[in-house]
């Protein structure tokens, strides 16, 4: 399908950028090369200390659709919120500045919305290892796009189980009417988990398309590889808030939320224990003990995590030894 500025609604593409001088060009090349051209591309430079600021300004001079905002470093959530505040598009899209997208990425998401008439469309992603990704993303023009309308419950179940629709903000196209719930918590990690369930709920239905044409870069030092306890603790708080938001009698996925909360609690305990943080370890040991009965009864919690909860109540010293042994063995593989 061919899109023109006259027949297609404006889409705001929000790109937060912090110290991404080695990735930003590839990201923006993939965005300005979209087949869907009626875009406002909002670059939010979040206090970068490398060449990111200069690159943002250079790209603004290259393409009139690009606008740049420079702000002091406040984190990913604040940068996204800044982009949301100044956006004028009928739809919003988030792309991380170290990732890339296929040339038809936005076209596919728009098509899913047009066919289904819903407020939110989504696709999955393809992982790219740093230093091994192609110069240009693989084109998807030769395949037939499969579009499926998912209920709120189906989308939540998918996200909670690592399915095709996740809690991440990128890889999606949001109707601007969802802005009221599309506010990221500032100063927190796992910010997408903290709000996306509310966005799903507000949207009611989600149009999923299977192009998988968001290219997610796995790089050393990224949050996905970090074991810092405060990051994992934010995940625990996010799933706790999600659990409190819903009633166990009114949704089919409640025990799956609980399983994710219990897993995040165990991960946080392990992180504090390995760091030698006695206060943090004690705090989460008490939470493990308090949740042992809940963990034992939860059918969605992995057996290994059930064992963590059981040992926390009966033999925390043995638990710590086993966790350290597991980490040491894992680091050798």
Give the location of each predicted region:
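Catalytic core of nucleotide-sugar-dependent glycosyltransferases
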Residues: 212-219, 226-253, 267-295
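Glycine-rich, basic loop-to-helix element that forms the pyrophosphate-binding segment
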Residues: 71-87, 97
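Donor-binding/catalytic cores of nucleotide-activated saccharide
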Residues: 76, 97-206, 221-227
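N-proximal low-complexity "stem/linker" segments adjacent to membrane-targeting elements
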Residues: 1-32
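Short aromatic/hydrophobic "clamp" motif used to bind/position activated sugar donors
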Residues: 92
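A conserved acidic beta->alpha catalytic loop
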Residues: 30, 37, 45-54, 72
């Amino acid at each position: 399908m061919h899109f023109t500025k006259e027949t297609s609604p404006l889409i705001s593409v929000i790109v937060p950028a912090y110290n991404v001088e080695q990735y930003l060009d590839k990201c923006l090349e993939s965005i300005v090369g979209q087949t869907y051209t009626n875009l406002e591309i909002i670059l939010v430079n979040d206090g970068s200390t490398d060449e990111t600021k200069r690159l943002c300004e250079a790209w603004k001079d290259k393409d009139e659709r690009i606008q740049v905002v420079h702000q002091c470093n406040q984190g990913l959530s604040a940068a996204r919120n800044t982009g949301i505040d100044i956006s004028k598009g009928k739809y919003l899209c988030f792309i991380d500045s170290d990732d890339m997208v296929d040339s038809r990425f936005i076209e596919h998401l728009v098509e899913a919305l047009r066919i289904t008439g819903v407020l939110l469309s989504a696709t999955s992603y393809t992982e790219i290892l740093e230093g091994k990704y192609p110069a240009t993303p693989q084109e998807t023009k030769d395949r037939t796009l499969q579009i499926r309308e998912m209920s709120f419950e189906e989308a939540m179940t998918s996200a909670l189980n690592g399915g095709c629709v996740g809690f991440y903000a990128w890889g999606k196209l949001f109707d601007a009417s969802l802005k009221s719930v599309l506010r990221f918590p500032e100063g927190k990690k796992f910010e997408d988990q903290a709000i996306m369930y509310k966005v799903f709920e507000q949207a009611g239905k989600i149009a999923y398309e299977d192009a998988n044409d968001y290219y997610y870069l796995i790089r050393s030092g990224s949050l996905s590889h970090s074991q810092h306890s405060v990051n994992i603790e934010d995940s625990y708080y996010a799933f706790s808030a999600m659990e409190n938001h819903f009633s166990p009698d009114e949704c089919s996925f409640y025990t799956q939320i609980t399983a994710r909360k219990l897993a995040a609690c165990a991960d946080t305990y392990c992180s504090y224990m390995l760091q030698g943080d006695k206060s943090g370890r004690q705090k989460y040991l008490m939470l493990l003990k308090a949740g042992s009965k809940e963990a034992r009864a939860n059918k969605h919690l992995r057996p290994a995590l059930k064992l963590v909860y059981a040992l926390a109540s009966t033999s925390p010293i043995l638990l710590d030894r086993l966790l350290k042994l597991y980490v040491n063995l894992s680091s050798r593989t």
